Amino acid sequence: VRRGLAEDLSSYRIREKQDTEMKQQFVETIKIKEGQAQAIAYHQERMERTIRHFFPSLGVASMPLLERLLAPKAHMDFYKARVVYGESGVESIEYAPYSMREIHSLQVVEDNNITYNFKSTNRDCLNALAARKGSCDEVIIVKRGLVRDTSYTNVALYDGKLWLTPRQPLLLGTKRTYLLEKKLIQEADLT
């Protein structure tokens, strides 16, 4: 049985956004469709994995429950909730309309040293690669000869029979995890 909202908020308090320099902050961006948060369990799992990795002293009992913290409204047909959190708790929750980016062209960029295993608010490494897109809409990031991700999304490529996703993406995306569990995509080494 999960704790009540008061316990969630007292043990892992929500604060107003403060000076964020020099703090490790992480983010979950959750799709809101017809007023309902989507794939909340996948976001919860990734957030808990991040907290356990970076802030192990906090323990499972102090982790916030996204389903209790999010309060989407019925009029939110196609929105996103951006939850920023760190060692001191959930620092902000913002809602905004979601707009799909149209991608028509891709630029391959290589970086053999990039790491982005956790969804951090510090996207400097990804932004530096995205800046190399030239006249293209987005980049495909290659590390050690293998396709990994774009600057904003995981990759899925159709080979005429199967949808394939990189075996070693930069970030384990929630949609990617869902599609793998449903066996709608398969992992492969993509070159």
Task: Indicate residue ranges for each PLM-predicted region.
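A short acidic/small-residue loop/turn micro-motif
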Residues: 155-156, 171
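Short beta-strand/strand-turn micro-motif
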Residues: 148-154
